[in-house]
Amino acid sequence: MAATAQTHFQSDERHTSLLSATTLVGPATVFVAAGLLAPLAILFRYSFNRFEPRRMMVETFSLDNYVKFFADPYYTGVLWTTLRVAALCTVVCLAMGLPLAYVLARTQSRFKNVLIMLVVLPLFVGNAVRAAGWMTLFGSKGFLNVTLMQLGIITQPLQIMFTEGAVIAGIIAVNLPYMVLTLQSVIEGINRNVEEAAFSLGAGPATMFRRVLLPLSLPGILGGTILTFILGMNAYATPVLLGGPKFKMMGPLVYGQFQLNNWPFGASVAFILMTATLTLTATANILIQRRFRR
């Protein structure tokens, strides 16, 4: 009798817990569906329509926009440039962010919070403002060129602005805090005794990093690389301001098509960008996890 009553009580408790969870998750689910999935579905449908200057968009179902993109070397070149820049920025952010995150996670200094604030501080400034700051540094009369000329290192200003290098530097500056914060939170959760045990067994710093810290930091590495790669692939303000009109990435290309009222082609470019980003991040995730499971 008591067992039956306890079973009913546990069943009611689970039902109440499930109902509460549904109540909490429900509004967010509706918001995401209405604010993200529905517009994406509409945009996906637009990508199969046809563009006409006078009518803007003609309802049809054709793959012409996708064929146009992959048949034109210019557009495939823009996609390749975007992939290259995003991948390079992600690798540099990981190489710079991992040591910095390790120091922040392990330091006992009373200035730790100050150091974290210095990492977070750039996030309080918009991408356009940060890009404008880089323009004052990289310009022909910017701080870098003026300093080098005054020191006699160069006689003519270096052409840094409106180059791929300027865009890469700007995107790295934008994405680096995300990488550092993601890695720091994971490294702080790794027990220090694990590292000390590796050292006591004769492992050097390089071996400890490769055999102990790196595998345990894998969730943070995956999260940070995926986040920075997605941000790099979809960058807009930085390529526009630091790359100029001749340097094209997918984000500005999508926006440019919508400015020209070519919604069908703009929608197809947007979905090509999204598909490439999701495919590459998922593939990298699978390959990295398989590598560290061995």
What is each residue range found by the language model?
Residues V194, L287-R294:
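Short cytosolic juxtamembrane segments of multi-pass membrane proteins
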Residues E59, G202-P205:
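Polytopic alpha-helical membrane proteins, predominantly small-molecule transporters/carriers
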Residues R55-E59, Y236-N261:
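Glycine-rich helix-loop "coupling/hinge" segments at transmembrane-helix boundaries
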Residues A198:
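The alpha-helix within a helix-turn-helix
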Residues M1-L18:
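Short, Lys/Arg-rich, polar N-terminal cytosolic tail immediately upstream
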Residues L201-G202, P215:
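Glycine/proline-centered hinge or cleavage motifs at structural transition points of membrane proteins
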Residues D12-T16, M56-E59, L63, F69:
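Short, membrane-interfacial amphipathic segments enriched in basic
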Residues S17-E52, V67-E188, V212-Y236, G243, ...:
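Membrane-water interface segments at the C-terminal ends of transmembrane alpha-helices
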